[in-house]
Amino acid sequence: MKKRIPTLLATMIATALYSQQGLAADLASQCMLGVPSYDRPLVQGDTNDLPVTINADHAKGDYPDDAVFTGSVDIMQGNSRLQADEVQLHQKEAPGQPEPVRTVDALGNVHYDDNQVILKGPKGWANLNTKDTNVWEGDYQMVGRQGRGKADLMKQRGENRYTILDNGSFTSCLPGSDTWSVVGSEIIHDREEQVAEIWNARFKVGPVPIFYSPYLQLPVGDKRRSGFLIPNAKYTTTNYFEFYLPYYWNIAPNMDATITPHYMHRRGNIMWENEFRYLSQAGAGLMELDYLPSDKVYKDEHPNDDSSRRWLFYWNHSGVMDQVWRFNVDYTKVSDPSYFNDFDNKYGSSTDGYATQKFSVGYAVQNFNATVSTKQFQVFSEQNTSSYSAEPQLDVNYYQNDVGPFDTRIYGQAVHFVNTRDDMPEATRVHLEPTINLPLSNNWGSINTEAKLLATHYQQTNLDWYNSRNTTKLAESANRVMPQFKVDGRMVFERDMEMLAPGYTQTLEPRAQYLYVPYRDQSKIYNYDSSLLQSDYSGLFRDRTYGGLDRIASANQVTTGVTSRIYDDAAVERFNISVGQIYYFTESRTGDDNITWENDDKTGSLVWAGDTYWRISDRWGLRGGIQYDTRLDNVATSNSSIEYRRDEDRLVQLNYRYASPEYIQATLPKYYSTAEQYKNGISQVGAVASWPIADRWSIVGAYYYDTNANKQADSMLGVQYSSCCYAIRVGYERKLNGWDNDKQHAVYDNAIGFNIELRGLSSNYGLGTQEMLRSNILPYQNTL
């Protein structure tokens, strides 16, 4: 039995099977120009019973045993065709067989083809009963796909299921180019299993052999097969030389895994990255476990830590079972706060301030749903590791619509908050929220009147440390009951734009909302889960200023806004603009002295927001938004982008984003917003571009500049060359990777990456632009 040892060579050939890049139609069509296609009518089913047709210039024989055909001999049966200068037909009776065995020997310019392969050589043999075929000292070419080579002997077996090569070679390069090839003493291609087995395999670049393996198994189709994927290498200032060698494991039809040894020179060890994917009756999920046994750099930088092991565990699951049960997991945990600064990972970033660990189980039937969940946070700040977790939380909703003209709902929540620090307050919170709605609507407008009661009870513990250090004392038991009343009206007006743009339609959509919530002093309640909600135009019409339930601001306000849209004759939205404001009749308060703007006693028009989108053409788009808050005395946030996009490989985008330091302080958790890099807010201008610059060459670049710090924030440049049988990519990235508190400046990481992949084994001809765009620390977002 021949020993089977998976080797690195499988990596270099199997890559196309697992690639997720899109198609580059131009390159794909160019590559297929050199590939033969099957141009005869395809015969379906069993072709062995079909008649054999023989055409030749001359024929002679001893009927019925032997016959010799010479001169342009052409033999056809079903999808198979054999041509040669001379063919000798032999027919013999076989004991126990109803039909005689018919074989042919072919000499001179032998050409065999069917809908799978073309074989050419000076000598051939075929069994017309079984379709077994031999061709000696010739070459072969796959039909309808890239793949060709040579062999001392080429055999078709198993009714064209197997192609067997003795001392053969394989390459996906087009005729005239042997950039790479695989040579083996025996190659067996199984079309049903979509796998090729190669013994004594040598991988060649041009005529030079560079790698040997006694056995190689590689996928040659879309069927999942275990094997090595393409290796990657890069150099970074954080880890120096890095090398990845991923292995794909097809465990079962409903589960697979990718195991990647990741060598990092500076760390002095190999990180094992293990990604597991599964599909079950309870849903689909993905798990990732990365483990570095020891890290010499971390050990030097943190001598007081008992262990230098670094690890990450990620689990994402979502599923429904029996149509009523819902299961969700969103769990990320790392060994230490510096993990995402030291290692690139798609499940977290150096700009993240925390990792979330959330589990939930839900039950839902008509008019009712309930969810039990737990939520924890791992804070990465070394200055303040305080954070609250919900252990556990119960949410219940009951709906009953069409109660006369009304819709009703009752929402309830019970949650227990625990802090990571022993001296911080903890609480059990119970909340009940009955709601009644009166919805009225017609073709041109709607009005929704809503009333609800917000009743919350707190039982707070562990208050001694906090109360001893603050003037405002927390209460062990606190109740808060407040009604809420809201009226929300909308109208939609529509007109044809025949004078300016025939076929176009414009809408005018005014909206007005009145909201009333009485003031309740919440200073005796600690803030466990509330923060200021980010606002855009639609956010102006929210009921709440804060997320969570610990801070419910009073409201006596009117929100007004208007949206206008323009649709073309194909009902595609070409333009929209929205502008709105909140007018406060009385100040919005919670009684919390830590909220600075509550001390201003401001009323009137305090918050403005606007959004716009303009699809100038099918290739040009403009998008922007702004929020102004007089309580912050400045623009709170703004963003804008303009983009030209010809297709997924040809695009240019300019963008700008801004967030004031006051806004960041108000919206983000305290342990996150006090980080030094956010004290001046965010003000970044950037550009992203992707374009094929020459035949088969493409380039991707991104550059972001921090106008507050007057320095580069992030940049990336990638270049890829793509051909029909290989692609090479080189990339450079400089990105923000944390903050040095001692030196009070940002820390950057520089990375140079190199990647090579073999093409032609699948339909992947992507130019690599989408993958390079996604790799940036600020990923590209489509404006159109």
From Swiss-Prot:
<keyword id="KW-0472">Membrane</keyword>
<dbReference type="Pfam" id="PF03968">
    <property type="entry name" value="LptD_N"/>
</dbReference>
<comment type="function">
    <text>Together with LptE, is involved in the assembly of lipopolysaccharide (LPS) at the surface of the outer membrane.</text>
</comment>
<dbReference type="Pfam" id="PF04453">
    <property type="entry name" value="LptD"/>
</dbReference>
<keyword id="KW-0998">Cell outer membrane</keyword>
<keyword id="KW-1015">Disulfide bond</keyword>
<feature type="signal peptide">
    <location>
        <begin position="1"/>
        <end position="24"/>
    </location>
</feature>
<keyword id="KW-0732">Signal</keyword>
<dbReference type="GO" id="GO:0015920">
    <property type="term" value="P:lipopolysaccharide transport"/>
</dbReference>
<feature type="disulfide bond">
    <location>
        <begin position="173"/>
        <end position="725"/>
    </location>
</feature>
<feature type="disulfide bond">
    <location>
        <begin position="31"/>
        <end position="724"/>
    </location>
</feature>
<dbReference type="GO" id="GO:0009279">
    <property type="term" value="C:cell outer membrane"/>
</dbReference>
<dbReference type="GO" id="GO:1990351">
    <property type="term" value="C:transporter complex"/>
</dbReference>
<dbReference type="InterPro" id="IPR050218">
    <property type="entry name" value="LptD"/>
</dbReference>
<comment type="similarity">
    <text>Belongs to the LptD family.</text>
</comment>
<dbReference type="InterPro" id="IPR005653">
    <property type="entry name" value="OstA-like_N"/>
</dbReference>
<dbReference type="GO" id="GO:0043165">
    <property type="term" value="P:Gram-negative-bacterium-type cell outer membrane assembly"/>
</dbReference>
<dbReference type="InterPro" id="IPR020889">
    <property type="entry name" value="LipoPS_assembly_LptD"/>
</dbReference>
<comment type="subunit">
    <text>Component of the lipopolysaccharide transport and assembly complex. Interacts with LptE and LptA.</text>
</comment>
<protein>
    <recommendedName>
        <fullName>LPS-assembly protein LptD</fullName>
    </recommendedName>
</protein>
<dbReference type="InterPro" id="IPR007543">
    <property type="entry name" value="LptD_C"/>
</dbReference>
